[in-house]
C-alpha cells in the first residue's frame, strides 16, 4: 500500500492552497464593444472591490475576452491599488466628502449598532474596508466606477489615525469621541 501522501515522480512537493488574504467583490460586469470594419468586437469589463476588512481597500477595473479573464485582471489591478483607510471603533473618525467626475459621495460616522447605511458600490467599499457602522449619501451621478473612486477618495481624505487621540473613559464620561490632537510647534 502507498502512503497517505503520494510521492510525485518529479519529487515536487504538493501544491499548497493559497489562503485568501483579501475579500473580493465583483461590483459590475459590462459587455463593451469596439467597432471595426467588419462589425463589433465584444469584450467584458469587470469592476472589482478588494479589501481585508482591517483598513485596506482597493479598486480594479479590467477588460478581458471572457468574464473570468476580466475578473482575474481586475483583482490583480485592485491588489496594486490598495490604500490604507483609518477605522475608529468600527466607524469613521469624522465626516468626509469627495467628488470624482459627477459622483459626489458623503460619508459620516455612526454610533455602534447602526450598521452600514449606504447604497450600491459605496456599501461594498465600506464593507470590504472593514467599517461596521457608517452613514453615507450619494449625490450626483450614480455611475458605479466614479462612485467607487469617490468613496475611496473620501476615505483617503480622512486624517491619518495617528492624529486622532482616544481619551480614556472615566466614570463621568460615557461616550468616547475622537479629539483632534493639537499641532506641536
Placement of each model-derived feature along the sequence:
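Intrinsically disordered, compositionally biased charged tails
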Residues: 1-20, 162-185
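Glycine/charge-rich, flexible interdomain linkers and switch-proximal surface loops
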Residues: 84-107, 166-178
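Glycine-rich phosphate/pyrophosphate-binding loops
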Residues: 129-145
Amino acid at each position: 500500500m502507498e502512503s497517505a501522501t503520494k510521492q510525485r515522480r518529479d519529487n515536487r512537493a504538493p501544491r499548497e492552497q493559497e489562503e485568501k488574504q483579501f475579500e473580493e467583490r465583483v461590483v459590475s460586469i459590462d459587455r463593451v464593444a469596439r467597432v471595426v470594419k467588419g462589425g463589433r468586437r465584444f469584450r467584458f469589463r469587470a469592476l472589482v472591490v478588494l479589501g481585508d476588512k482591517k483598513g485596506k481597500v482597493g479598486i480594479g477595473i479590467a477588460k478581458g475576452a471572457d468574464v473570468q479573464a476580466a475578473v482575474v485582471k481586475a483583482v490583480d489591478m485592485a491588489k496594486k491599488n490598495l490604500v490604507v483607510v483609518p477605522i475608529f471603533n468600527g466607524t469613521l473618525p469624522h465626516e468626509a466628502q469627495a467628488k470624482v467626475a459627477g459622483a459626489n459621495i458623503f460619508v459620516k460616522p455612526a454610533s455602534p449598532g447602526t450598521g452600514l447605511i449606504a447604497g450600491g458600490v459605496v456599501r461594498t467599499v465600506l464593507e470590504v474596508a472593514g467599517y461596521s457602522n457608517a452613514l453615507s449619501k450619494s449625490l450626483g451621478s450614480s455611475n458605479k466606477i466614479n462612485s467607487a473612486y469617490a468613496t475611496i477618495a473620501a476615505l483617503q481624505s480622512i486624517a491619518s489615525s495617528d492624529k486622532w487621540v482616544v481619551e480614556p473613559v472615566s466614570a463621568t464620561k460615557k461616550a468616547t469621541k475622537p479629539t483632534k490632537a493639537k499641532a506641536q510647534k
